[in-house]
Amino acid sequence: MAKDAFTDDNRTPVRIPLATEPVGILKSWQMMRENVLNIIPEQATEEPVISGKTAKRWHMVMDPGAIQQILLDRVEDYPKSTVTKNLLRPAIGESLFIAEGAHWRWQRRASAPVFSHRNVAALGPVMTAAAERTAQRVAQAGPRAVNMLDEMITATFDVIAEVTFSDDGSFDRNAVHKALETYVNDAGRVSLLDVLGMPDWIPRPGRTTASAEMAQMKQDADAAIEARAARGPGDVPDLLDLLLAGQDPKSGRSMTTSELRDNLLTFIVAGHETTALTLAWSFYLCAFDSRVQDKARAEAQKVLQGRAATTADVENLPYIRQIIDEALRLYPPAGVVSRTAQKRDTLCGADIQPDDTVMIPIYALGRHKLLWDNPDQFDPDRFQNRKSIKRYAYLPFGDGPRICIGASFAVQEAVIILATLLSRFRFTPVKGRDPKPVMVITLRPEGGVWLMAEPV
């Protein structure tokens, strides 16, 4: 692990040492179970592509042109990997995140209007209220250290629960949260059977049990969806109302109850976990570099004048946005994405065969020495001119037709919460409690982000 990084003199925040020598199948599996980032070689920050073989042939691709080939030019030839689908399907079914081909396309067309600029902006008051509640909780902690990871998980789950099912009491939010957390903890780790390429029909220990525990929660969700469909939308439509009204403009198809449920669960997972992690890392980085924090606070205080941030403020908080962008570069929630090649191809000279695993190690991509100046340094100014960032070198939300449908929602929420809290508190580190970047399904700060929060 990196040396203590909570000083302004040390300009390198925490970083996981990447692999420097090849390992066998069993060791590779053990490393992945502990931290998926462990399988990324240091070479991945220096080379355009790396190839190898464990039980199956694999390739890690870091060249932006080749990544464009995977995510845009030949996207149909690179569906999500079988391992990814096996991990997530029991929780979110054949939703937008998992589905491929025509089944994905009609769902995307039906869902896209839900996340229009108008609809996302209309949900802003929920984010503002969550930011205010979070500020009050932090203030009540007094002179004690605050785990900003826990605070951000609470804040973002409150937001996604409110904008998904509103506050009509038809759905037990805590039960949803617990079921999803249990699934990730119990079943979200790669099985040795996955690494060995064993058939899908062979049960994965832990995953079967966790899937069974999800069944009751899904039944409750179905009942809530059917009750809402019978009752109709509220004064301000939430995501469920918008999805119920949604229709594929090409086929006229609408989602069934199970399709609605799977997509809502996808939005709940993606809509709070990734934003919470981005915010937690952002607070860590602001505490790491007090100069950046002071500059951000000055911007936030000038714009907000003591109130919580709103949707209308987001465009006037460019430096806050730059901090979030830089946090996503250094600590992307999806540190590695994986695809399974369907056809022969060539990527930067690498021969790609059908059934090869093709990975984009986004964690390494954001630290690549040929793509970024001083890549391990925390420097929000590198995003001052976003047009200077090479496309496909920066992929916090993916790219191509499968780019994250909720990206604008996530950015709006993150800016509102970060600006509100920085305008009211000065965050400083707790010595000896550096977080450790660990990826199971998402890249989390293991141990939490413990900071002192002094009112200003």
What is the predicted function of each stretch?
Residues 2-13, 44, 131-135, 152, ...:
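Cytochrome P450 proximal C-terminal region
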Residues 353-354:
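Residue-level recognition of short, solvent-exposed, well-ordered loop/turn junctions
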Residues 274-293, 297-299, 408-425:
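Cytochrome P450 catalytic-core helices
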Residues 1-18, 79-85, 103, 119-277, ...:
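Cytochrome P450 heme-thiolate monooxygenase catalytic core
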Residues 26-48, 219, 223, 307-348:
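Conserved cytochrome P450 K-helix E-x-x-R motif and the immediately C-terminal K′/meander segment
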Residues 360-387:
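Conserved cytochrome P450 K-helix/beta-meander segment immediately N-terminal to the heme-binding cysteine loop
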Residues 2-106, 121, 125-133, 155, ...:
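N-terminal membrane-proximal hinge/A-helix region immediately C-terminal to the signal-anchor transmembrane segment
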Residues 232-237, 297-317, 330-350, 359, ...:
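Cytochrome P450 fold signature focused on the C-terminal beta-domain
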